[in-house]
Amino acid sequence: MKALLLTFSLSLLAALQAQAFPTTEENQDVSGTWYLKAAAWDKEIPDKKFGSVSVTPMKIKTLEGGNLQVKFTVLISGRCQEMSTVLEKTDEPGKYTAYSGKQVVYSIPSAVEDHYIFYYEGKIHRHHFQIAKLVGRNPEINQEALEDFQNAVRAGGLNPDNIFIPKQSETCPLGSN
């Protein structure tokens, strides 16, 4: 369960099998504050344990050269901890790598304004996984964006039954429970 939560927490991502999605613009601006609206992955969620997961907004900053710095706070072992990672820009628009190229992240604009689908695939501890996330500029669920995400999940070969919608939390003070 901890490995699954860590995988979930560390994955910031973008679009299910590039051929299933439109090409992205060269200079898409994903910097700013984003809220996780929904997530789905290729692994079964044990007893839907993530139903009570609370997430805080993530901050994305565009670095020199087009790389992205992603920061967010997660509750790990009962304590709030800040996580940060750098997504390295590739030659392909909307495609990034993380952890020395071991993981690939695609950033795909949703059909709904101010929403993106991040699709992430890679390996952690020799286990391959795929995760898709719907993020938006505000914390409210947008039904049209959720339907777009469900279609993207299906198109990408992930199971729409594995979609879960986390609870939104504005803060998780570092070190707090």
Swiss-Prot record:
A GO term, aspect molecular function: small molecule binding
Coiled-coil blocks: none
Record's signal peptide: 1-18
Intracellular or extracellular location(s): Secreted
GO annotations of cellular component type: extracellular space
Transmembrane segments: none
Key word Signal present: yes
Pfam families linked to this entry: Lipocalin
Gene Ontology biological-process entries: sensory perception of taste
Keywords from the UniProt entry: Disulfide bond, Secreted, Sensory transduction, Signal, Taste, Transport
Disulfide bonds: 80-172
General function of this protein: Could play a role in taste reception. Could be necessary for the concentration and delivery of sapid molecules in the gustatory system.
Similarity section: Belongs to the calycin superfamily. Lipocalin family.
Subunit structure: Homodimer.
This protein's name: von Ebner gland protein 2
Species the sequence originates in: Rattus norvegicus (Rat)
